[in-house]
A protein has these predicted regions:
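Short amphipathic alpha-helix that is part of the acyltransferase structural core
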Residues: 1-38, 190-213
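A short helix-loop-beta-strand connector motif used in the catalytic cores of GNAT acetyltransferases and
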Residues: 36-52, 56
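Conserved beta-strand in the GNAT
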Residues: 50-52, 59-69
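Structured loops at beta-to-helix junctions and adjacent beta-edge loops in soluble globular domains
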Residues: 54-56, 69, 86, 119, ...
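Flexible loop/turn segments at secondary-structure boundaries
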Residues: 60, 70-73, 122-124, 173-174, ...
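Acyl-donor binding region in acyl/amide transferases
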Residues: 73-161
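Acyltransferase donor/substrate-recognition loop-hinge adjacent to the catalytic core
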Residues: 142-213
Length: 213
């Protein structure tokens, strides 16, 4: 994979969603980290590959990635690989080419099933297909084109489980029950508890505290 192709893999969604105000662009570094063996521990027990699809005029019309995580695959009833980072123009033909490409690669490596859209490694980002509620997504939640559902279902993908995400306006009046406020007041009076605002100069310490929690 050349530097130019890696860059195009990241840049294509930015063009695809440029007129969609609800789309939140992932950090380039986060996407690259998924495919970097030095930053993704999943490579110690698996492998990943990614492709871009171009049209007759040479412009990118889609992208996809495929993964094999041996630990996750062994936990399934049959050898199962993963498909993710799927993005495509509104073209069923292009979508099926991407699906076929991932399927063939996985099949050649002994996989009998394909799960997607998923991520290679941690399952807190880039997991799932949004099928309802096309509003601005919460952190780490999937967002995609509405027509993706038709392509996945037409290809033969079936719903494995459903996941819901919700938004809550923390600035709204009575957003928390009164008992929560009483509990917070009670805890705040106990010795050993302090409240501090985030300080950029001590970002490492605050990050370490968050990780420990």
């Amino acid at each position: 994979t050349t530097v130019a192709l890696r860059r195009e893999f990241i840049e294509f969604p930015k063009r695809l969603y440029r007129d969609d105000p609800n789309w939140v662009c992932p950090l380039d570094s986060e996407t690259e980290a998924v495919f970097d063996p030095s930053r993704n521990a999943a490579f110690s027990h698996g492998e990943a590959i990614r492709w871009i699809l171009t049209g007759d005029d040479g412009t990118t019309i889609g992208r996809v990635a495929a993964f094999i995580d041996e630990e996750r695959s062994d936990a399934n009833r049959q050898p199962t690989g993963g498909l993710g980072f799927f993005e495509v123009i509104e073209s069923r033909e292009a979508a099926f080419i991407l699906f076929d490409t991932a399927k063939q690669w996985l099949s050649q490596r002994g996989m009998k099933a394909m799960d997607g859209p998923i991520n290679f490694g941690e399952n807190d980002n880039y997991w799932g297909l949004l099928v309802e509620g096309f509003t601005r997504p919460g952190f780490g939640m999937p967002y995609n084109k509405k027509y993706y559902r038709d392509y996945f279902e037409a290809y033969g993908f079936m719903t494995y489980f459903e996941q819901y995400s919700y938004h809550k306006d923390v600035g709204a009046v009575e957003v928390f029950p009164e008992r929560f406020k009483k509990i917070a007041e009670w805890i705040s009076k106990r010795p050993g508890y302090t409240y501090r605002h985030f300080e950029l100069s001590q970002s490492d310490k605050f990050a370490a505290d968050m990780v420990e929690i």
